[in-house]
Amino acid sequence: LFDAVRSDFLRYGYGGYAVEQKSDGAFVGFTGFHNFSFDVDFAPGIEIAWRLKQEYWNRGYATEAAKACLDYAKENLPFTTVWAFTALPNKPSQRVMQKIGMEFEKNFMHPSVTDGHPLKEHVLYKSLL
């Protein structure tokens, strides 16, 4: 994982940023940007994503970190559109997308998920920087 994050920073100047707990510096997870390209009508693009340790879910870390990433991108990064997507059942992640001001675009069937799988259907959100 470290090599992939490092590679994105070297290639694009952005990637996943470590999220730490303010009180003690404990590692919470990652939030940041990822280039994506798969067979959908909104690709290629830049995704904002968050991956946190489960013990830190539902405590505001993803929202705070994602807002900080979007603010940073507006001033410092070379793109103007950011996407976020998640499986339809992942309501907590959808709430983060809404809280950081992203707009719902549509539902779509993720081409990398097997047909018939319960996580095949995804929701797509968009933010213009």
Residues covered by each model-derived region:
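Active-site rim helix/loop that mediates acceptor-substrate recognition in acyltransferases
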Residues: 1-13
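Acyl-donor (CoA/ACP) binding surface of acyl/acetyltransferases
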Residues: 18-129
